[in-house]
Amino acid sequence: MNQEDNTGGGGIFGLFKWTKDALFGTDISPSMKYKDQEERRDRSRYAQDDTNFSMKFGNDSNRRSTNLSRSNSWSGLDSTLHRKYELLPEYNENGFNSIVNGDHHSKERIRSLRSPAPIVPREPLRNEPTDTFGHRLHTKRRTINELSNSQIPFIPPQEDDPLLSKLFNKDGVNEVRRSPYKLSVKDIPGKFPSPLTKRDEIDNYYVRDEDACHKNREYKKAYFDLFAQMDLNSRDLEDLCEDVREQREQFHRNEQTYKQAYEEMRAELVNELKKSKTLFENYYSLGQKYKSLKKVLDQTISHEAELATSRERLYQEEDLKNFEIQTLKQRLSDLELKYTNLQIEKDMQRDNYESEIHDLLLQLSLRNNERKDTSAGSNIFSTGQ
């Protein structure tokens, strides 16, 4: 027995080592440990104990968490484990190795014993350091939109919040930090105690519980004082809001009055500007008319001077024309008299010419008659021969 204990390959020490390895993990790599098990090849990570979970989470909300499961004492019962710890293999009723010979019922029994128990995920209330079940690792993370649709998002207070600053003042915080007892999630019932819990802390649990109750009463009193102060502040705030509302209404009334006065003054100023513009336009038109009239007056004076000169010249020309007219009238009367005399003389000459023409025609007719008589006598004489 002592020799077996010293070798570390079996006996009590071997059983202790096997139990320790089964609970807290072994030095065997997962690839070697589960090499011959086809049903476990799709698993990427393994959990050796409730306190030894590992899982990778991403920031992506759509990434699904890998379901981790608890291992038990039947995990890793393969030929390698039997050879390492010098364990006897399992035999069936016929005396053969049930795993090697392929006994279906034995394999199912071993598989059911080796398969870990399922863990039901739940929503973690807080980040507990002693939560050995790792529930928060199996919880599906919800997106911000899902949280906003289901409930109002929690907004933490700022560091400079007056209520929190008064409730948790600097002295009180330092006192809590210096105290040996600190209220944490380890004191919540239903959780496993931390392995690092000191013995004196466990012994002084009731004393610390009384201190915590006393501090809780102090906190309640401080809360009630703060609530009373908040009530007074709310009343002061309501009064202040009422004053602000009245001042705002007065400001709006004054603004409306000023606006109306401004509109009236602006309309009056616009009318005055229009009148001034009309007056300036009339003054400008009168000035232009005055200049044009003055120019016309100057032209009229010059024209009157020219007219007087022209009148004198016309008078002189009129006298000359009158004299010429008299001269021409005299000449015309002389010419008319001369024309009358010439006409009378012409009539007398015409009468003389007509009488001469009549005499000549008479002589011509007589000569023609004589010629006719002579020619007739000669014709008669020629016919008689």
UniProtKB/Swiss-Prot annotation:
Gene Ontology cellular component terms for the protein in this record: central plaque of spindle pole body; cytoplasm; membrane; mitotic nuclear membrane microtubule tethering complex; nuclear envelope; spindle pole body
Pfam families per record: BBP1_C, BBP1_N
GO molecular function: structural molecule activity
Residue ranges of the region described as Disordered: 34-76
Low complexity bias locations: 64-75
One BP annotation, GO: protein localization to spindle pole body
Residue numbers carrying Phosphoserine: S29, S73, S115
Keywords assigned: Coiled coil, Cytoplasm, Cytoskeleton, Phosphoprotein
Chief subcellular location: cytoplasm
Coiled-coil region(s): 229-355
Biased composition annotated in UniProt, kind: Basic and acidic residues: 34-48
Subcellular localization: Cytoplasm, Cytoskeleton, Microtubule organizing center, Spindle pole body
Quaternary organization: Homodimer. Interacts with KAR1, MPS2 and SPC29.
Family: Belongs to the BBP1 family.
UniProt remark on domains: The C-ter coiled-coil domain is sufficient for localization and homodimerization.
Note: Present with 922 molecules/cell in log phase SD medium.
Function: Component of the spindle pole body (SPB) required for insertion of the nascent SPB into the nuclear envelope and for the proper execution of spindle pole body (SPB) duplication. Connects the central plaque of the SPB with the half-bridge. Required for proper localization of CDC5 at the SPB and for proper M-phase progression.
Name used for this protein in its record: Spindle pole component BBP1
Organism of origin: Saccharomyces cerevisiae (strain ATCC 204508 / S288c) (Baker's yeast)
Gene (UniProt): BBP1
